[in-house]
């Protein structure tokens, strides 16, 4: 039995928990909060040049005002395709073509929609918590496996405490991110 069998890779556990947090921030970025943000356009792909191309690869996206996103499409022949992709995306924003520029006025959210988005954000946060707890479970399984091949009881306790500390830190980060996102959503 080697010493490597008794080591727990905390860095790998931390990376997987960080991955869950990154996925949560990506999900939060896709929620429309009533404020203009280029991230609401990230999931949109345009049928360009014979393939599905991310919108941000077809032009520059700017946020000149709190309720306005402006897209300057580089290839003027793609303007109608970009406009159609935005309309068909289901993000609920009507693009306005103004020459070579597409303007996206972000409508004000009503109270009911804000509460609905807040619940969606809470759902995303819960998914992240579950993913983090699954990583914790995998780490604890590694510890049990190491114990079965000769890890000392004290070492098992130390590693378990380390994994739990990483889990607690990650869950706290999820809760903080959710609180911030819900505050942003509910702000009029």
UniProtKB/Swiss-Prot annotation:
It comes from the Bacteria. GO terms for molecular function: ribosomal large subunit binding. It holds the Pfam family RRF. Its main location: cytoplasm. This is Ribosome-recycling factor. The keyword Protein biosynthesis applies. Signal peptide: none annotated. NCBIfam families: frr. It comes from Cereibacter sphaeroides (strain ATCC 17023 / DSM 158 / JCM 6121 / CCUG 31486 / LMG 2827 / NBRC 12203 / NCIMB 8253 / ATH 2.4.1.). GO terms for cellular component: cytosol.
């Amino acid at each position: 039995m080697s010493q490597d069998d008794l080591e727990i890779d905390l860095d790998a556990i931390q990376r997987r928990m960080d991955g869950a947090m990154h996925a949560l921030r990506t999900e939060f970025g896709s929620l429309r909060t009533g404020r203009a943000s280029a991230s609401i356009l990230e999931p949109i792909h345009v049928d360009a040049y014979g393939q599905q191309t991310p919108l941000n690869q077809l032009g520059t996206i700017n946020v000149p005002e709190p309720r306005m996103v402006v897209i300057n499409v580089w290839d003027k022949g793609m303007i109608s395709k970009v406009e159609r992709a935005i309309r068909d995306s289901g993000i609920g924003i009507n693009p306005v073509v103004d020459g070579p520029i597409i303007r996206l006025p972000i409508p004000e959210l009503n109270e009911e929609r804000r509460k609905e988005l807040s619940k969606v954000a809470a759902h995303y946060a819960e998914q992240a918590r579950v993913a983090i707890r699954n990583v914790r479970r995998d780490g604890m399984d590694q510890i049990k496996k190491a114990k079965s091949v000769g890890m000392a009881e004290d070492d098992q306790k130390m590693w378990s405490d380390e994994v739990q500390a990483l889990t607690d830190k990650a869950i706290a980060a999820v809760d903080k991110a959710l609180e911030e996102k819900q505050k942003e959503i509910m702000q009029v």
